[in-house]
């Protein structure tokens, strides 16, 4: 369990960990998995990107803004997923996942080290019972997750520092998620600054810095 800009997350890198995550959260398995990327190089080696999507990630990386986009996997990246059943648990039926950057220094450092040193993925989910928030406090992750986690990194002060003026009732507990695929999981076409091109990016979930991302 690691702190992020919006709260606490469960991080794991294989099927056993994914199974434990679903069991601990009592969560349904029909949503795209979340893949944490500790570098843009990792992102580009895993996900299919158009020049516009690549530029979007680059801008938010440079501005240190949390961003997650639902994208299809590169064909050559699929073979890097552990052959242990992980694939079925960390992507949806369209073979898409949500690829996330700039989620917070503690987790970013872990994800980068796992990938650069060991070639391991970092799959993630919020560390709270499904449908509930943790309020940015390690005390809010719940007894089930606490009992099943191998390691819990407590950094309530760090989480609070990202949204210091927001009360717990109005603070964001998640990052922005944007779908960059059509109903079949294929990349949307280049938009070229126009509004008539479809399919187009879809804001699936509001979150931290949504005003900056949508500007």
Say what each PLM segment does.
Residues 1-215:
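Active-site-adjacent structural elements in enzyme catalytic cores
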């Amino acid at each position: 369990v690691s702190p992020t800009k919006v709260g606490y997350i469960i991080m794991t890198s294989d099927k056993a960990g994914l199974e434990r995550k679903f069991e601990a959260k009592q969560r349904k398995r029909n949503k795209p998995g979340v893949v944490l990327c500790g570098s843009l190089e990792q992102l580009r080696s895993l996900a299919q990107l158009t020049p516009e999507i690549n530029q979007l990630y680059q801008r938010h990386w440079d501005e240190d803004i949390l961003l997650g986009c639902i994208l299809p996997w590169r064909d050559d990246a699929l073979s890097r997923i552990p052959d242990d059943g992980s694939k079925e648990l960390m992507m949806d039926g369209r073979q898409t996942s949500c690829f996330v950057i700039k989620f917070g220094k503690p987790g970013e450092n872990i994800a980068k080290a796992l990938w650069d040193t060991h070639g391991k993925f970092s799959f993630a989910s919020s560390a709270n019972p499904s449908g509930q928030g943790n309020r940015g406090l390690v005390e809010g992750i719940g007894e089930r997750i606490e009992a099943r986690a191998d390691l819990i990194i407590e950094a309530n002060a760090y989480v609070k520092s990202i949204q210091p003026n927001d009360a717990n009732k109005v603070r964001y507990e998640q990052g922005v998620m944007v779908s960059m695929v059509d109903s079949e999981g294929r990349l949307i076409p280049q938009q070229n600054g126009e509004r008539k091109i479809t399919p187009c990016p879809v804001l699936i979930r509001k979150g931290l810095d949504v005003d900056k991302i949508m500007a």
